[in-house]
């Protein structure tokens, strides 16, 4: 698929469209995702086997002392199939950019945003799905969505001061009682069948996550009111927003966009790497994903959009709502000179404006152009990058996804900032579980890198320099 995409770009728009359509219909003969995977996996296994036989000893990169002390930043050490993050272009899902996904992925009737089901199909197969395939996936998830009674009881008895992410992680861990993989492994299943059970568990978990997340929301913020029943005629996002208690069509559209663009961001981020690592021990998808959610709950990973909103609210308190560019510029400089950062700006990998920010900005320009908070975000977009460039410290002065998402959620009435990371988690399931299926299909082994002590590292460096 990546080769088709690259070739399409080289051949120009007209031929590109033909190639994309060819790729789209290459897997259009079936609406059963598992059947399509069963056809794709042996071919990919053979391709990688040949590649490793020919190039297994090829050196990919060098590791420096700074990389080891610096969070392994920039170290090439993982194979992650579903997405790749380009510093200049942003995320590509199986070779497709966000604008391409917005254009090509199927949409709900009367909707304009891509359906997350379509993105999951793309992440798993490498192909843009048909509307029929996406409809099959929506119905399949609806069919698998019911929660076991012990998980419902557990959620209903959590104290209201327990953080929503702690509740999500605990509930997903408890869903491990339903794991097909864990039961089959205990009975001695063949390694060649691992992916099939991981697929079943992943499909079940993705189907159940909106129910878990909605129950958490209702218990914490809506006095424990019921989430209602899943409607098999609605898509995954629409059922989710219904269960949350939101009926605004635009909010459902925003949710479709949000769940699509937050789904995957290559394999080195904390949640994706955690899922990959825990899964490599043959922990089932429930345990692997729960571990990923504990990583996402960390303030350096999943809480950034909350920090942006807190900063924006504080900014408005201090300088007022109708602030001039000059006053705003002074406020930003005061923030930087006090040793703080401007939340929502910069990224560990990206060196341009995050395309996830851009598509949210376009949504806001279309649906809420006069919202005061959006106007402030748009004003910051004009000013902050220039200030950061003047300061000269930031490698990337441009806004990331977190600079915008919270403002959109607030506009539609979801003001409970502690809950935002749960939405992020529901979305991230699409990416990390698609990869988990492929990790078992390709037989990736237990992850076990070599560690060194500072003393050992110093001796090693001395031996090299001597």
Curated annotation (Swiss-Prot):
One of its GO terms (biological process) is carbohydrate metabolic process. It is an enzyme of class 2 (transferase). Pathway: Carbohydrate metabolism; tricarboxylic acid cycle; isocitrate from oxaloacetate: step 1/2. A motif (SIFI-degron) lies at residues 2-21. Keywords: Acetylation, Methylation, Mitochondrion, Transferase, Transit peptide, Tricarboxylic acid cycle, Ubl conjugation. Oxaloacetate binds at residues 356, 428, 448. CDD domains: ScCit1-2_like (cd06105). Residues 1-27 form a transit peptide. The modification N6,N6,N6-trimethyllysine is found at residue 395. One of its GO terms (molecular function) is citrate (Si)-synthase activity. The modification N6-acetyllysine is found at residues 76, 321, 327, 375, 382, 393, 459. Citrate synthase is found in nearly all cells capable of oxidative metabolism. Key enzyme of the Krebs tricarboxylic acid cycle which catalyzes the synthesis of citrate from acetyl coenzyme A and oxaloacetate. This is Citrate synthase, mitochondrial.
């Amino acid at each position: 698929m990546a080769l088709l995409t690259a070739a399409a770009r080289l051949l120009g728009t007209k031929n590109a469209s033909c190639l994309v359509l060819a790729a789209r219909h290459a897997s259009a003969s079936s609406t059963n995702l598992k059947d399509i995977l069963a056809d794709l996996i042996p071919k990919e296994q053979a391709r990688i086997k040949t590649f490793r036989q020919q190039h297994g000893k090829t050196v990919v990169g060098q590791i420096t002392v700074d990389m080891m002390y610096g969070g392994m930043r920039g170290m090439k050490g993982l194979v992650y199939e579903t997405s790749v993050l380009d510093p200049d272009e942003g995320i590509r899902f199986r070779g497709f950019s966000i604008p391409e996904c917005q254009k090509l992925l199927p949409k709900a009737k009367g909707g304009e945003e891509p359906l997350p089901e379509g993105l999951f199909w793309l992440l798993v197969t490498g192909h843009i799905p048909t509307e029929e395939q996406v409809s099959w996936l929506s119905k399949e998830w609806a069919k698998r969505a019911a929660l076991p009674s012990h998980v419902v009881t557990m959620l209903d008895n959590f104290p209201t001061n327990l953080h929503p992410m702690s509740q999500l992680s605990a509930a997903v861990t408890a869903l491990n009682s339903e794991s097909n993989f864990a039961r089959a492994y205990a009975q001695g299943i063949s390694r060649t069948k691992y992916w099939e059970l991981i697929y079943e568990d992943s499909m079940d978990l993705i189907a159940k996550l909106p129910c878990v997340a909605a129950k958490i929301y209702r218990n914490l913020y809506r006095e424990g009111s019921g989430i209602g029943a899943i409607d098999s005629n609605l898509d995954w996002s629409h059922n989710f927003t219904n269960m949350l208690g939101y009926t605004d069509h635009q909010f459902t559209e925003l949710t479709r966009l949000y769940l699509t663009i937050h789904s995957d961001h290559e394999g080195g981020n904390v949640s994706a790497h955690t899922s990959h690592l825990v899964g490599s021990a043959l922990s089932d998808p429930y345990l692997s994903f729960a571990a990923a959610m504990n990583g996402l709950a960390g303030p350096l990973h999943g809480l950034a959009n909350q920090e942006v909103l807190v900063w924006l609210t504080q900014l408005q308190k201090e300088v007022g709502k109708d602030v001039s560019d000059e006053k705003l510029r002074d406020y930003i400089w005061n923030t930087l000179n006090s040793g703080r950062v401007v939340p929502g700006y910069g990224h560990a990998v990206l060196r341009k404006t995050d395309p996830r920010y851009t598509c949210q900005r376009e949504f806001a320009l279309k649906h809420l152009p006069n919202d005061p908070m959006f106007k402030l975000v748009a004003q910051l977009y004009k000013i902050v990058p220039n200030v950061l460039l003047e300061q000269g410290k930031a490698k990337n002065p441009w806004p990331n996804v977190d600079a915008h998402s919270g403002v959109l959620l607030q506009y539609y009435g979801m003001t409970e900032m502690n809950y935002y990371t749960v939405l992020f988690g529901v979305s991230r399931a699409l990416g990390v579980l698609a990869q988990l299926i492929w990790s078992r299909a390709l037989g990736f082994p237990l992850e076990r890198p070599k560690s060194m002590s500072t003393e050992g590292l110093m001796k090693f460096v001395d031996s090299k320099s001597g």
